[in-house]
Amino acid sequence: MFERNCRRQVLQKTNEGEWENIMNEKLQIIFGLLGGLAVFIYGMNMMSECLQKAAGEKMKSILALLTKNPVLGVIAGALTTAVLQSSSATTVMAIGFVSAGLMSLPQAISIIFGANIGTTMTAQIIAFKISDYIYIIIFIGFIISFIAKSEKVKSIGQTIFAFGLLFLGIETMGDVMKPLASSPVFTNLIERVAHIPVLGVFVGTLMTLVVQSSSATIAVLQNFASQPGPDGVTSMLGLAGAIPILLGDNIGTTITALLASIGQTKDAKRTAVAHCIFNISGCLLFIWFVKPFAALIQHISPKGPEVEVISRQIANAHTLFNITMTLIWVCLIKFMVKIVMTLIPDGKAVDMDSAKPVFLDDKIINQPAAALQLVAKEILRVSEMVKVVVADTITIVKTEDMNELEPLQEKGLQ
């Protein structure tokens, strides 16, 4: 009896110890993944901010010049986003220019189409295998930013430093994901996601809504898909399983943009809606051709063991998806404008004789070029009002008709 109780206690302690080890391992994976994701997002945001400091004004000039037709607008949007590594920054610039009257809504929408292509550059960069050089890159970036006297050179150093952090985050996420390959529960879950495209779209959308960055969730997807299955060669997820999640990531980022446009100008809302239509229509189109699309990507991408090339394949799928949808929608840009104008109409006409500011918009105060243009338009509007008031005053003085004074006073109080 005593021996049986001893065995039971030993077994119970063993089970408790195993359960504690399992929980510790799971917590390490969760916090490692979250920590790696945090480093990645911080590095990406820092790199974007530094690039905007170094080249932001030049990119604004390019945007203003290359928007005479939709094709040039697409090129300008893609180039600006690729350089700044931020589709949000490009979108904000475009909205600011529309509000200031520097470009039309179709031109702004074409820039958004280009921004969708430019943002795929992040995924292409992530697909490079530079894990052996991460700490060298971080060190070089730190030294340049630490010893530089010029603000521009310091921004370049910080950009290099942030670039290294971005890959450090990716490397951290990859390291903590490796134990998941041996988990039967997790592999069964992944098999379900891989075989049900709609579920993959839902997972991708939810991930982007939570993280608030499609570049970050696509980086997680690339990293996760690069984890080997039981045979050590094939991907846990596979390209056909990754594409629906990729489509969901694209939908998630449009919902984020829609939420961000609440309380903004009508043009900001129209731009967000156009972005939403672009990605949702793409998802609805591509979801029916996941396997043929995956086969095409595998054909045009580098060959090799799946776990080594799938990150590049996902990046290529992301790029080809956005290029295809841009080619479709740039031909239908007038139709897109009609849709967004119908969904968000102009409403009542602007009262140009109002005593309150008409063109000033504090939402674009951080864009000096666009804000100054709005100030100039407001000054011209008020100048016209002053000219009318002065002319009416001179008429009243000459005619001595005091009955004309009351309408003039009312005009000044509007």
Predicted segments with their positions:
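Short, Lys/Arg-enriched N-terminal segments with co-localized hydrophobic residues
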Residues: R4, R8-I22
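Helix-loop-helix hairpins and the membrane-proximal interhelical loops
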Residues: N24-P70, I160-L206, F224, T234-S235
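C-terminal ends of transmembrane helices
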Residues: M44-K53, A94-S99, G141-K154, A257-G263
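Alpha-helical transmembrane segments of multi-pass membrane proteins, especially transporters
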Residues: E57, S61, L65, N69, ...
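Membrane-interfacial helix-loop connectors
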Residues: T81-L84, V92-G118, Q124-Y133, I144-S145, ...
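Transmembrane alpha-helical segments and their short flanking loops
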Residues: I170, M177, A181-V193, P230-M236, ...
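Non-transmembrane accessory domains of multi-pass membrane transporters/channels
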Residues: I323, V330-Q414
